[in-house]
Amino acid sequence: MLDPFSEKAKELLKGFGSINDFMDAIPKIVSVDDVIERIRVVKNEKLIDKFLDQDNVMDLAQFYALLGALSYSPYGIELELVKKANLIIYSERLKRKKEIKPEEISIDVSTAIEFPTEDVRKIERVYGKIPEYTMKISDFLDLVPDEKLANYYIYEGRVYLKREDLIRIWSKAFERNVERGVNMLYEIRDELPEFYRKVLGEIQAFAEEEFGRKFGEIQGGKLRPEFFPPCIKNALKGVPQGIRNYAITVLLTSFLSYARICPNPPRRNVRVKDCIKDIRVITEEILPIIIEAANRCSPPLFEDQPNEIKNIWYHLGFGYTANPSLEDSGNSTWYFPPNCEKIRANAPQLCTPDKHCKYIRNPLTYYLRRLYLEGRRNAPKRGNKRGKKELLHQ
């Protein structure tokens, strides 16, 4: 298989039923050791040969096992390792394939079959050889926005690509699809078998061994509003009657509390008191932001619904009360932030996607992604035990 996100791969997955069914079946198809062997190509590319002619089901099972593991830690060195290892494997398969058929990869390309007669010689002179593939300019710029179109032959709204161009642009789509796949599984991670947590542990152990230090998950801490998703920023500005309760009590309360206290919870039934020791984190850091946003609503939420503050505490997991103690945590469910689909359905006015939204399915993973990218941008370029640059900078 050339691409685990291709139509061919999707057809194979359909044979298992739903994605949940496939994820349940994976532990019966591959072992943890099988899966971890796949990421070892990052350390030793000589291992790649064993993955080049793999059975399609085995290949998909190993790949999705890694994505399932990442659903518990969606942004960090683990993601970079999984991306890099699989790019090595699938890129090599593409390079060795005599003819890449458009339906075998996950980007929308066509075989280049027509050229204006007067352009053929010019194309050969300028580009060295006749391009083999074409794609829409809009799709091209979406994947490689910094590329100069002047470096490519353009005809009737399509960019013409040589084989090496195709593989390079495909790699950008592949990385994006990996993140999308992880975010999809993030929504069902509480339903996944324990197998995937074991895979994650082995990925983290490999990273620690390879890079000489332990990589932890993103922890709770001071909120970074500049990295909030658009829906949260819109809710903070205040909203009109009709979506006030959803925007403030459901969305903002859940997002701010998890983002500040437990941005990457180990499970969905976690309680506030499992994560903090002082309720003032809520009363002094989170609640004032919620109240300010509620007061910006039209009309202000608490003017005509003063008891809604009790509902906010209820959604934080303290039960329906106005003055809880930390020990009351667990009297109700600490609501997890709704996913993007639910936000669009209940409060479409809040959903104004930006360029980062294309990767995610939940506002909390948006925040995790932005924090991760900022950390990667500011990380010092330190060498690992073998004198290589850290993977984060490769």
Swiss-Prot record:
GO biological process per UniProt: DNA replication, synthesis of primer
Pfam families: DNA_primase_lrg
A single GO molecular function term of this UniProt record: DNA-directed RNA polymerase activity
Keyword Iron: yes
Keywords in alphabetical order: 4Fe-4S, DNA replication, Iron, Iron-sulfur, Metal-binding, Primosome
Binding, [4Fe-4S] cluster: C231, C340, C351, C357
GO cellular component, one term: primosome complex
Keyword 4Fe-4S: yes
Cofactor names: [4Fe-4S] cluster
SUPFAM superfamilies referenced in this protein's UniProt entry, alphabetically: PriB N-terminal domain-like
Superkingdom of source: Archaea
Cofactor: binding details: Binds 1 [4Fe-4S] cluster.
Family statement: Belongs to the eukaryotic-type primase large subunit family.
Quaternary state and interactors: Heterodimer of a small subunit (PriS) and a large subunit (PriL).
Function according to Swiss-Prot or TrEMBL: Regulatory subunit of DNA primase, an RNA polymerase that catalyzes the synthesis of short RNA molecules used as primers for DNA polymerase during DNA replication. Stabilizes and modulates the activity of the small subunit, increasing the rate of DNA synthesis, and conferring RNA synthesis capability. The DNA polymerase activity may enable DNA primase to also catalyze primer extension after primer synthesis. May also play a role in DNA repair.
Alphabetical list of NCBIfam families matching this protein: PRK03968.1
Name this protein carries in UniProt: DNA primase large subunit PriL
